[in-house]
């Protein structure tokens, strides 16, 4: 089968066809102020409707605590989720255990207690917690998905039906992926983090150092079915000068506190970026605090990717650096949104 010159150009632009090299070259660099404005497309009502649909989905009362690989067998984690002290550690088999972070005896902070042979031993009076109910201390359901640790807090929302496991998006095989988890926190609520991620139109304007040539190919209608509730975006990741990596990505919200970006075409097809928002409580000024736990699970079938996997200790910090730069901006977006909502000045 032969192609005309026009057909060849169309095929070369098809995002489903990957070039031999992952990089592309922009014909010309468009100055930031000359790119197409997106404010008309980024309709507050449309974004708000997508947020409302996400908030209506079941979470099963599961909250992300942190990166699985960071929880070792020698020291516990201490976390505050929805104002509740939580402690998490690994037992002698390496299985995570979770429960209240306050010792039931006299209130010692269990996050400061050591783990000995899988047992958490309170450093005030030696109460030993193996993960079973002890002296008024009751364990909490906990889940390790290989990337993240989750804890289930049924007391937070008794209207939610508890689920046996968190609502997880499809992921590439972990043994064939590079995994990085970045965590930060800010003065906002979970809905502000999710709303930020359900606004893909801000990408090339707000993050010009990372994204160029962003086009929202399709956005969900306000009364769409679940299977159509996705934002599809063509975007190029900026490398240097006119050198870019063009991809197509789909943004979905599988549960109220999670937004997932799937790379569906282009370099890294099958890779995902999961953005999870965990409510922490309030700060000394009474402002809500929310943690962002963002997991990047990158994969590729290119031969060179195997080399990148071997360089995991170097790739991880680089991926975290990139996420940190983006979230410095996106947290400012989320905090501004929360401030405007709290003062009745938020549009829409």
Question: What are the roles of these predicted feature ranges?
Answer:
Residues 61, 75-77, 84, 147-149, ...:
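A generic secondary-structure signal marking the coil-to-beta-strand transition
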Residues 59, 136, 143-145, 269-271, ...:
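A short, structural micro-pattern
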Residues 5, 164-348:
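C-terminal catalytic domain of Rieske-type non-heme iron oxygenases
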Residues 59-68, 72, 124, 131-132, ...:
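Short Pro/Gly-enriched beta-strand edge/turn motifs at strand-loop
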Residues 9-45, 91, 95, 99-102, ...:
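N-terminal short leaders/motifs
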Residues 5, 66-170:
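Rieske [2Fe-2S] iron-sulfur-binding domain
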């Amino acid at each position: 089968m032969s192609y005309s010159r026009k057909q060849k150009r169309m095929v070369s632009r098809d995002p489903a066809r990957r070039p031999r090299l992952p990089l592309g070259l922009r014909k010309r660099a468009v100055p930031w102020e000359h790119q197409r404005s997106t404010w008309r497309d980024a309709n507050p009502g449309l974004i708000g409707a997508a947020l409302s649909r996400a908030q209506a989905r079941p979470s099963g009362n599961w909250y992300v605590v942190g990166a699985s690989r960071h929880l070792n067998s020698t020291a516990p984690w201490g976390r505050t989720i929805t104002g509740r002290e939580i402690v998490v550690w690994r037992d002698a088999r390496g299985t995570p255990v979770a429960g209240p972070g306050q010792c039931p005896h006299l209130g010692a902070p269990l996050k400061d207690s050591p783990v000995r042979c899988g047992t958490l031993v309170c450093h005030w009076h030696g109460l030993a917690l193996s993960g079973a109910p002890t002296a008024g201390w009751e364990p909490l359901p906990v889940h390790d998905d290989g990337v993240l640790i989750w804890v289930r807090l049924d007391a937070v929302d008794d209207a939610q039906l508890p689920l046996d496991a968190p609502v997880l998006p499809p992921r590439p095989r972990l043994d064939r992926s590079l995994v990085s988890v970045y965590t930060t926190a800010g003065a906002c609520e979970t809905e502000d983090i999710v709303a930020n991620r359900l606004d893909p139109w801000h990408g090339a304007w707000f993050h010009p150092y990372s994204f160029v040539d962003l086009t929202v190919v399709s956005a969900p209608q306000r009364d769409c079915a679940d299977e159509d509730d996705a934002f599809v975006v063509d975007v190029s990741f900026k490398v240097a000068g006119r050198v870019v990596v063009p991809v197509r990505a789909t943004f979905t919200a599988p549960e109220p506190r999670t937004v997932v970006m799937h790379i569906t075409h282009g370099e890294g097809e099958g890779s995902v970026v999961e953005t999870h928002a965990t409510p922490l409580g309030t700060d000394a000024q009474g402002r809500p605090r929310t943690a962002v736990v963002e997991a990047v699970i990158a994969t590729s079938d290119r031969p060179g990717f195997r080399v990148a996997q071997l360089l995991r200790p170097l790739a991880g910090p680089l991926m975290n650096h990139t996420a940190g730069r983006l979230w410095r901006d996106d947290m400012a977006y989320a905090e501004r949104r929360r401030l405007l909502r709290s003062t009745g000045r938020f549009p829409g």
